[in-house]
């Protein structure tokens, strides 16, 4: 049946090589036949060619890959599909019964949507013959084993009957391009066949001409060995084998008249002619079956010996009897013929076959097989992998059985048989074919994996089939022609391998050199450089002087051609390292008509395309000189492009990336004292410009009366934000401030009244002895005209004896603060009078009071709800809890407590005014160009946690950090299109590092505005003019981190205040070199980039991304892995991934920060790290797919077929452009883990209350999966002109935003298991990681958990250190919560 896209887990190791790229370039220019040794990578050249063709051809055209056998079709399809996962591919072979597809609609359905078809030659030839497929549908035809394209072969039929006539009639545009692949360009010994193959395929034969030495380096020619044996006497079987002799005797004496077919013909007079013919020829079905069976038995005897022949006869007779009993297996056989064959063979005496003999002499073998055993015994058994070619299928099965049971081989070799996939249903043999086709399905995979180490096969394994490199290949019979010799020898391509041919001692044509000489003669017809090898070696010994010199513009640094190679290799060595990528420069050469050479060098794909490829300027006689000159020109280009400094060294970790010299900045710095705004006010009071703001105090959101006051200052009063003051659990006060207004012509006496009133309020709520100084900085007064203040003061200043107040019958609701002078004037709140009459003439008056609140910081909610008394006297309380004081010892303030309570709020108001003055000053000076709308965000940004204010900078710093990283990343990306990702990353790190930001804070004077003083509410005293005048500023210690944090917090505050534009202005204030507004984001990124190559892309998948690219080359770049070296016009995705990383941070952090539930900075950081975790992004990348309809053909009856429909997923990762089997193997391994863990991870993301740390650590996806997400984000950002909105759409499309919302809305626990363990443990817990080497050369990881120097347990066998640590942490959580019944973190 047809195979569709699949993976080949054990594809042969492969690394990109120069000669493969050379062959690719040649195939793009003309039709060629790639002639290279077996194992040198021809199929991978074809894969590159297919990829290139699909990028440029019309999407309705097909690439058709042709192979001579079904097995080879299946193998090549696996290679193509696994290396081009984005391409829909399929096979069409006889296994699909294509010969029965007689309807055009069937063919249309089969080909619909597929871009690559792999089939045998006959399938395409027949389809073309019947018009089901037209030559115009084909973009590229690839002929594997192209030497078959001769004479009447179906390959030649395709060319002669369809290609050439179409070419003649309509021209080259009407026919597909041609590529042939072969390791043996001639089949027989006639070298003229090379020209015939070229003509038939309309192609020229090419072998790598410029890198022959590299080709030989990777192609290991085996040691050729002859194995001699004494041939068996053909007539000796009669006496040597009783069973075979009896079989032969019975066959010789077989009476044709007893044949059921003859007897049937004799009974019918109409069949007289057929009867005569049968009697004359002696051919009937039964006689032919027996004849072939006897011949095969004799052949096995001669090849393998008596035991094998008797085994074959015994097994064949048993198989026949089993088939006769099985009506399904016997099919259409004639019952009489079945009975006749069974009866004939039943008379043959058969020996008992013993499979478990320990005596080698019990296995009577032929001299030829004995020679084979001796050879195998002498072979190196370490990592043995062998292949034995035999002539006949029956020999395959018999030899496999014999090797599997013989004492010399059964313990040493794991044998398997292989005869290919020819349609066995077409064979009419019911006797003697012992091979079970189903048992060989896994043979090749078992051999590649090492489960089998010796295959016995027919010539079906000569051509194309991808096998692991063999250490031993044996031809049990001489190769029939040159093609077989070359192909079989090519199987032995392991280093120090052996290719053996068995010869009888009486063979006169056993000279192995005959094949070698003939092969060399054929190859020379198309390989000129082989004949010139000696002269080239002589030329390379010449010493050519390369006179080139480069001097740094501002230094005395010099580069000569002799130094250029070392410098260029060093430049490549310090590029950002990438797995699966060879970072070395690649040199190639071209030759002119004079035989001179010119070099070309290609640098790794992370280097900008403009300087990635450099050609030499002169022609040279030697490769060595050409390389020197080319390396010099390349390094000169790097210098001129700005990637090398004036010292002629790479920029990485050099001063060129530093914007400021920070030296070694200490972690603790001496900085300015906190700015004190009262000093300016102190001087302003000498000639005040009185401003006042009306204050309104409401209790419980306005329920009840208002208290109105005024705040007075000597100069402009900044707007103050409303304040909420928490009296107790049920009572709050809201303090609002009206806009300040100037009050002209306030006499000095009125100012003094204000000072007295301010002192009165401060004293009314204090038990301390107040200072006589009244030169307060901020003044407070009731909401009256200044002319009325004197009268108000006369009314409420002072106190009266309690007895006097009692006697006046004063309104309890207007009672002032009670002061018990027996307790040194301790204040109380009046509750009620208590009067006791001991006698008629004497009454004792007492006061039941409530304790005066000790709390002074009303800005924070109180922690104990019952710790305060209520203000409202109507609230009942138990008298037993209230102190009773004697009226005679008390006085009561004239100022009612309902007014005096304002004195408790003055400290908070003054502190709020102070911080507002600091923020206003900062806004109007350092931040004057930032255009903050409000100082509220500035206040938050400059308040350190140490100040213990209601808000601090931590949340804004979290936001500002990402905004700064985003802005700097954008600026460097757009400003330096010549910089690779390494320079960009280091340049960004230089700018956003704490020392650089701390220096910016010091340079601008920001350090003075950072609030670190803590409000001491209990010891607070109102600031006085006399204290501030003449005060000398001091210094304070501050950490570098705090300085940097405040800069980032101000950036975050600016973003909250006015969006990105305000944030960019703030960044520019502290980092003048960052000016993103000055960068044209729409044109800067592509300003020096050449046009990228085309790249096939699924249109529906592009729609699924949620963004339509104006410049699709950006999407191509976003999908180009650094290993993709075949496209020198497109840079790898590393730059876009660098930018996308910052874009993703910006999108995620904004969503976290702006969520309705405000979280502390620590929680936001944990959420961010969980959401942008590389394994989560990789999982979403693997999941990001569309579903497409896939049509296929199913057989509904014997001759009927129907089109079936199914759905298949097309994932984004399939479109990543790469090269290299290492990356492919890693990709497939990650996808296998994804398939195993998908349900668990997906379920966790949708339902679990915890983040799936454990499952994601086991996923251990390669980084390129998450890189693709970030690089596509970067591409969208660039193409949209720096617009974050379409980036947010893509993040939504991949499912990341949905999971982030779930985390934020439902409080998903994102703590890392290790953090959970540390929180659960009452003592320090240590995780000790260890790398454990494995026998296969790899490594696993283990992690032990230790508590108080005792080891709790060890987790072993983990793929990575992260998995080991997370698994250990999960187990530790179980251990620590084993008695609680549930764990705080599931293993999800």
From Swiss-Prot:
Residue sites binding ATP per the record: 36-43
Marked site: Important for activity: 1263
Pfam families per the UniProt record, alphabetical: DEAD, Dicer_dimer, Helicase_C, Ribonuclease_3
Motif DEAH box, chain ranges: 144-147
UniProt GO cellular component terms: cytoplasm; nucleus
Lineage top rank: taxon: Eukaryota
SMART domains referenced in this protein's UniProt entry, alphabetically: DEXDc, HELICc, RIBOc
One record GO biological process: regulation of defense response to virus
Binding site for Mg(2+): 1137, 1267, 1270
Gene3D superfamilies the record matches: Dicer dimerisation domain, P-loop containing nucleotide triphosphate hydrolases, Ribonuclease III domain
Limits of the Helicase C-terminal domain: 368-537
PROSITE patterns per UniProt: DICER_DSRBF (PS51327), HELICASE_ATP_BIND_1 (PS51192), HELICASE_CTER (PS51194), RNASE_3_1 (PS00517), RNASE_3_2 (PS50142)
Limits of the Dicer dsRNA-binding fold domain: 564-658
Residue runs in coiled coils: none
UniProt GO MF annotations: ATP binding; helicase activity; metal ion binding; ribonuclease III activity; RNA binding
Keyword terms, alphabetized: Antiviral defense, Antiviral protein, ATP-binding, Helicase, Hydrolase, Magnesium, Manganese, Metal-binding, Nucleotide-binding, Repeat, RNA-binding
Residue intervals of the Helicase ATP-binding domain: 23-203
CC cofactor: Mg(2+); Mn(2+)
Enzyme type, top EC level: hydrolase
Occurrences of domain RNase III (ranges): 906-1059, 1098-1281
E.C. number(s) listed in UniProt: 3.1.26.-, 3.6.4.-
PANTHER family attached to this UniProt entry: DICER-RELATED (PTHR14950), ENDORIBONUCLEASE DICER (PTHR14950:SF37)
Chain's role: Dicer-like endonuclease involved in cleaving double-stranded RNA in the RNA interference (RNAi) pathway. Produces 21 to 25 bp dsRNAs (siRNAs) which target the selective destruction of homologous RNAs leading to sequence-specific suppression of gene expression, called post-transcriptional gene silencing (PTGS). Part of a broad host defense response against viral infection and transposons.
Family the entry assigns: Belongs to the helicase family. Dicer subfamily.
Protein name (record): Dicer-like protein 2
């Amino acid at each position: 049946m047809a195979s569709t896209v699949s993976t080949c887990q054990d594809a042969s190791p492969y690394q990109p090589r120069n000669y493969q790229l050379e062959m690719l370039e040649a195939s793009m220019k003309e039709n060629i036949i790639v002639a290279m040794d077996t194992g040198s990578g021809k199929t991978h050249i074809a894969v590159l060619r297919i990829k290139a063709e699909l990028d440029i051809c019309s999407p309705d055209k097909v690439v058709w890959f042709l192979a001579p056998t079904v097995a080879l079709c299946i193998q090549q399809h696996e290679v193509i599909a696994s290396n081009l996962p984005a391409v829909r591919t399929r096979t069409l072979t006889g296994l699909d019964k294509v010969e029965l597809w007689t309807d055009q609609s069937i063919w249309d359905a089969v080909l619909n949507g597929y871009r690559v078809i792999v089939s045998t030659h006959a399938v395409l030839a027949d389809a073309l013959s019947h018009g089901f497929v037209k030559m115009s549908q084909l973009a590229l035809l690839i002929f594997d084993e192209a030497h078959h394209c001769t004479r009447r072969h179906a390959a030649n039929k395709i060319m002669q009957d369809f290609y050439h006539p179409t070419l003649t009639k309509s021209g080259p545009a009407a026919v597909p391009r041609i590529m042939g692949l072969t390791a043996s360009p001639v089949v027989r010994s006639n070298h003229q066949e090379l020209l015939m193959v070229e003509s038939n395929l309309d192609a020229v034969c090419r072998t790598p001409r410029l890198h022959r030495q590299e080709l030989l380096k990777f192609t290991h020619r085996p040691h050729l060995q002859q194995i001699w044996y004494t041939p068996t006497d053909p007539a000796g079987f009669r006496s040597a084998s009783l069973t075979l002799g009896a079989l032969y005797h019975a066959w010789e004496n077989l009476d044709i008249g007893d044949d059921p077919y003859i007897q049937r013909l004799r009974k019918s007079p109409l069949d007289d002619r057929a009867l005569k013919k049968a009697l004359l020829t002696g051919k009937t079905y039964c006689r032919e079956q027996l004849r072939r069976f006897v011949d095969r038995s004799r052949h096995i005897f001669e090849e393998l010996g008596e035991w094998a022949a008797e085994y074959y006869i015994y097994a064949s007779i048993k198989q026949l009897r089993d088939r006769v009993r099985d009506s399904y297996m016997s099919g259409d056989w004639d019952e009489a013929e079945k009975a006749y064959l069974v009866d004939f063979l039943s008379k043959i005496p058969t020996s008992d076959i013993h499979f478990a003999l320990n005596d080698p002499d019990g296995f009577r073998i032929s001299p030829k097989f004995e020679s084979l055993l001796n050879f195998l015994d002498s072979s190196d058994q370490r990592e043995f992998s062998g292949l034995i070619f035999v002539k006949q299928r029956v020999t395959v099965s018999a030899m496999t059985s014999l090797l599997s049971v013989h004492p010399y081989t059964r313990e040493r070799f794991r044998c398997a048989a292989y005869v290919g996939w020819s349609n066995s249903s077409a064979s009419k043999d019911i006797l003697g074919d012992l091979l079970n086709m189903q048992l060989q399905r896994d043979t090749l995979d078992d051999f590649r994996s090492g489960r089998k180490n010796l295959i016995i096969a027919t010539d079906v394994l000569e051509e194309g089939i991808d096998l692991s490199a063999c250490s031993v290949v044996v031809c049990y019979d001489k190769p029939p022609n040159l093609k077989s010799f070359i192909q079989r020898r090519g199987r032995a391509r392991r280093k120090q391998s052996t290719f053996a041919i068995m010869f009888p001692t009486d063979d006169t044509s056993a000279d192995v050199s005959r094949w070698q000489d003939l092969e060399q003669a054929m190859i020379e017809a198309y390989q000129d450089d082989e004949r010139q090898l000696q002269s080239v070696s002589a030329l390379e010994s010449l010493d050519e002087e390369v006179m080139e010199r480069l001097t740094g513009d501002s230094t005395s640094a010099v580069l000569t051609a002799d130094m250029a190679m070392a410098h260029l290799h060093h430049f490549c060595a310090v590029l950002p390292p990438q797995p699966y990528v060879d970072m070395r420069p690649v040199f190639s050469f071209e030759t002119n008509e004079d035989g001179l050479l010119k070099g070309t060098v290609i640098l790794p794909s992370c280097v900008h395309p403009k300087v990635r490829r450099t050609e030499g300027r002169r022609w040279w006689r030697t490769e060595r000189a050409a390389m020197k000159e080319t390396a010099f020109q390349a390094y000169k280009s790097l210098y001129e492009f700005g990637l090398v400094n004036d010292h002629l060294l790479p920029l990485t970790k050099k001063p060129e990336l530093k914007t400021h010299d920070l030296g070694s900045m200490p972690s603790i710095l001496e900085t300015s004292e906190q700015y004190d705004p009262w000093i300016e006010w102190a001087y302003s009071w000498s000639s005040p410009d009185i401003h006042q703001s009306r204050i309104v105090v409401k209790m419980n959101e306005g329920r009840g009366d208002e208290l109105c006051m005024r705040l007075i200052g000597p100069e402009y009063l900044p707007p103050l934000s409303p304040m909420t003051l928490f009296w107790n659990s049920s009572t709050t006060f809201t303090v609002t401030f009206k806009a300040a207004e100037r009050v002209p012509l306030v006499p000095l006496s009125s100012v003094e009244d204000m000072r007295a009133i301010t002192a009165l309020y401060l004293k009314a709520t204090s038990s301390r002895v107040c200072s006589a100084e009244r030169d307060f900085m901020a003044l407070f007064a009731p909401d009256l005209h200044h002319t009325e203040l004197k009268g108000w003061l006369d009314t409420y200043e002072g106190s009266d004896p309690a007895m006097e107040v009692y006697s006046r019958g004063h309104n309890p609701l207007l009672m002032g603060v009670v002061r018990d002078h027996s307790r040194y004037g301790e204040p109380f709140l009046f509750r009620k009078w208590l009067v006791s009459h001991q006698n008629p003439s004497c009454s004792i008056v007492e006061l039941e009071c409530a304790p005066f609140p000790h709390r002074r910081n009303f800005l924070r909610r109180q922690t104990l709800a019952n710790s305060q008394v209520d203000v409202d006297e109507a609230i009942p309380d138990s008298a037993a809890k209230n102190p009773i004081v004697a009226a005679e010892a008390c006085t009561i303030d004239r100022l009612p407590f309902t007014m005096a309570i304002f004195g408790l709020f003055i400290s908070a108001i003054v502190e709020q005014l102070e911080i507002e003055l600091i923020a206003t000053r900062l806004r109007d000076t350092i931040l004057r160009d930032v255009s903050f709308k409000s100082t509220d965000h500035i206040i938050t940004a400059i308040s350190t946690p140490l100040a213990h204010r209601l808000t601090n900078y931590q949340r804004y710093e979290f936001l500002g950090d990402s905004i700064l990283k985003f802005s700097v990343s954008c600026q460097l990306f757009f400003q330096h299109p010549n910089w690779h990702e390494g320079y960009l990353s280091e340049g960004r790190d230089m700018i956003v590092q704490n020392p650089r930001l701390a220096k910016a804070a010091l340079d601008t004077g920001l350090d003075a505005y950072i609030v670190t003083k803590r409000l001491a509410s209990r010891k607070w005293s109102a600031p006085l003019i006399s204290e501030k005048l003449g005060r000398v500023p001091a210094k304070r210690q501050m950490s570098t981190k705090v300085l940097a944090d405040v800069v980032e917090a101000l950036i975050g505050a600016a973003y909250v205040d006015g969006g990105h534009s305000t944030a960019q202005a703030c960044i520019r204030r502290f980092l003048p070199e960052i000016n993103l507004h000055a960068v044209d984001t729409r044109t800067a990124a592509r300003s020096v980039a050449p046009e990228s190559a085309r790249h096939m892309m699924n249109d529906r998948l592009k729609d699924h991304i949620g963004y339509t690219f104006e410049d699709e080359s950006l999407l191509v770049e976003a999908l180009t892995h650094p290993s993709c070296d075949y496209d020198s016009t497109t840079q790898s995705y590393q730059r876009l991934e660098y930018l996308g990383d910052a874009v993703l941070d910006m999108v995620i952090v904004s969503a976290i920060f702006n969520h309705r539930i405000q979280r502390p900075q620590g929680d936001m950081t944990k959420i961010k790290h969980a959401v942008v975790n590389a394994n989560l992004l990789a999982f979403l990348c693997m999941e990001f797919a569309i579903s497409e309809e896939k049509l296929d053909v199913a057989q509904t009856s014997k001759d009927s077929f129907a089109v079936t429909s199914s759905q298949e997923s097309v994932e984004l990762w399939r479109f990543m452009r790469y090269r290299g089997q290492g990356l492919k193997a890693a990709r497939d391994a990650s996808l296998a883990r994804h398939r195993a863990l998908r349900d668990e991870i997906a379920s966790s993301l949708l339902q679990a209350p915890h983040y799936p740390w454990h499952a994601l650590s086991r996923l251990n996806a390669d980084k390129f999966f998450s890189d693709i997400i970030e690089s596509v984000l970067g591409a969208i950002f660039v193409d949209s002109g720096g617009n974050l909105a379409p980036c947010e759409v893509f993040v939504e499309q991949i499912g990341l935003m949905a999971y982030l919302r779930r985390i934020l809305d439902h409080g998903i626990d994102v703590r890392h298991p290790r953090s959970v363990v540390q929180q659960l443990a009452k003592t320090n817990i240590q995780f000790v990681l260890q790398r454990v080497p494995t026998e296969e050369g790899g490594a696993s990881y283990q992690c032990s958990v230790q508590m108080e120097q005792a080891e709790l347990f060890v987790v072993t066998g983990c793929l990575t250190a992260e998995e080991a640590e997370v698994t250990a942490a999960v187990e530790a959580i179980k251990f620590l919560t084993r008695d609680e019944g549930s764990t705080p973190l599931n293993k999800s």
